[in-house]
Swiss-Prot record:
Annotated Pfam families: Peptidase_C12 (PF01088)
Protein name: Ubiquitin carboxyl-terminal hydrolase
Family that this chain belongs to: Belongs to the peptidase C12 family.
Function: Ubiquitin-protein hydrolase is involved both in the processing of ubiquitin precursors and of ubiquitinated proteins. This enzyme is a thiol protease that recognizes and hydrolyzes a peptide bond at the C-terminal glycine of ubiquitin.
Active site as annotated: 93 (nucleophile), 164 (proton donor)
Gene: Uch
Residues in UCH catalytic domain copies: 3-224
Keywords tagged on the record: Hydrolase, Protease, Thiol protease, Ubl conjugation pathway
Marked site (Transition state stabilizer) residue numbers: 87
Species of origin: Drosophila melanogaster (Fruit fly)
Taxonomic lineage of the native organism: Eukaryota, Metazoa, Ecdysozoa, Arthropoda, Hexapoda
GO-annotated biological processes: positive regulation of glycolytic process; protein catabolic process; ubiquitin-dependent protein catabolic process
UniProt site (Important for enzyme activity): 179
InterPro entries: Papain-like_cys_pep_sf, Peptidase_C12_UCH, Peptidase_C12_UCH_sf, UCH_AS
PROSITE patterns cross-referenced by the UniProt entry: UCH_1, UCH_DOMAIN
């Protein structure tokens, strides 16, 4: 498996990254400093996605396996334009979460560049084929590596990274968890433009509740850029 340098959960670096990929400067990645109602009010609006970084603990891996076995028995329907891709490149989860966040929000303008080219090239492909396409995309690899090196902690490629990024988005009134390590998108119930922030925060709290002794969680959001 190809290994990339892991991205830091640094909103400034991630904002620079999405802009380099072609996302309009009108959008940025922002820290979510708390998940209670009063702190959620501080997040710049509109909020188009939550990005959660969490530890892949034994408890979480057990939950993931049980969830997979439960959902694979059900033929769930998803919107045709839900963009979902698998992750086959080690440490690419940050990039995959950003792709999921941007690609599932038509309001987020993307100029011609690496990301737009990738989305157009993979539009008709399966989630697995999209993951393989990213693995072979030399431009995406180069951009990821360049920005990953700007993080506050330059983790070496051979280090074992136990944290993982996922995206939470509102797609046609359903809150989706998009995780390239999983075989399919995960539905977390109904949501709306007005309730998305609180609904996504609730899902983040559920991740934290599964590992009550763990503190290594980071929550970010794709939002309108602050003026």
């Amino acid at each position: 498996m190809l290994t990339w340098t892991p991205l830091e959960s640094n909103p400034e670096v991630l904002t620079k990254y999405i802009h380099k990929l072609g996302v309009s400067p009108a959008w940025s990645v922002t820290d979510v400093i708390g998940l209670e109602d009063d702190t959620l009010e501080w997040i710049p609006r509109p909020v188009k996605a939550f990005i959660l970084l969490f530890p892949c603990s034994e408890t979480y891996e057990k939950h993931r396996a049980e969830e997979h076995d439960r959902i694979k028995e059900v033929e769930e329907q998803h919107p045709e334009d839900l963009f979902y891709m698998r992750q086959f490149t080690h440490n690419a989860c940050g990039t995959v979460a950003l792709i999921h966040s941007v690609a599932n929000n038509k309001e987020v303008d993307i100029d011609r560049g690496v990301l737009k080219d990738f989305l157009e090239k993979t539009a008709s492909l399966s989630p697995e084929e999209r993951g393989r396409a990213l693995e072979k995309d030399e431009k995406f690899t180069a951009d990821h590596e360049a920005l990953a090196q700007e993080g506050q902690t330059n983790a070496a490629n051979h280090e074992k990274v136990i944290h993982h990024f996922i995206a939470l988005v509102n797609k046609e009134g359903t809150l989706y968890e998009l995780d390239g390590r999983k075989s399919f998108p995960i539905k977390h119930g109904p949501t709306s433009e007005e309730t998305f922030v609180k609904d996504a925060a609730k899902v983040c709290k559920e991740f934290m509740a599964r590992d009550p002794n763990e503190v290594r969680f980071t929550v970010l959001a794709l939002t309108a850029a602050q003026q």
